[in-house]
């Protein structure tokens, strides 16, 4: 749950792919579109993949996905057939999402609010490890988190995700304000 590869690993991976002629495909379905505090999470590592998969954030809840290809691939009209691709409503939603991300500075907000949450969450001794970037945060505990999640949702009305039995996942909307982050921390503290 929310394990961030090191820059060294990612750069060595890029190097190995380049040296062997292997295509580097990065899955940015969850981490892309500002979630990590940069538009794409791999931008923290100063690398360029050959293919990037995107979804989730691209449509802000509307079902949409995409594949971004590097210039090394020559697109050929009619090469890929689909019975569902190019949905006009989905494409309109994706364009609107891009406008809102830019106009409301949501990537910058995800970084600022995420950095604040990461720093504050590290102060809780009950948490074994705090990891993540931007508004993609994993909290690992020594004990299973089932009861903690139940108290958060039923007592404090805070929905969280989970990974395995011991990791609480925080993936709030990119528009989460600093005030809302502080409110989350206050509610989180109550259930620990």
Region locations from a protein language model:
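Conserved N-terminal phosphate-binding loop of PLP-dependent enzymes in the Aspartate aminotransferase
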Residues: 1-192
């Amino acid at each position: 749950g929310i394990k961030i590869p090191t820059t060294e690993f990612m750069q060595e991976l890029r190097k190995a792919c380049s040296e062997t002629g292997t295509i580097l495909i990065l899955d940015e379905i969850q981490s892309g579109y500002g979630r990590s505090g940069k538009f794409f999470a791999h931008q923290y590592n100063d690398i360029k993949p050959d293919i990037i998969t995107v979804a989730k954030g691209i449509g802000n809840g509307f079902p949409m996905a995409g594949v971004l290809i590097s210039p090394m691939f020559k697109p050929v009209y009619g090469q890929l057939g689909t019975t569902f691709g190019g949905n006009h409503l989905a494409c309109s939603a994706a364009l609107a999402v891009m406008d809102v991300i830019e106009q409301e500075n949501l990537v910058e907000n995800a970084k600022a609010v995420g950095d604040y949450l990461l720093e504050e969450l590290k102060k809780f001794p009950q948490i074994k490890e705090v990891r993540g970037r931007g508004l993609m945060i994993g909290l690992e505990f020594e004990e299973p988190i089932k009861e903690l999640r139940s108290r958060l949702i039923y007592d404090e009305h805070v929905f969280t995700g989970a990974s395995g039995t011991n990791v609480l996942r925080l993936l709030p909307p990119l528009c989460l304000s600093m005030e809302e982050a502080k409110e989350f921390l206050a509610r989180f503290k109550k259930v620990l």
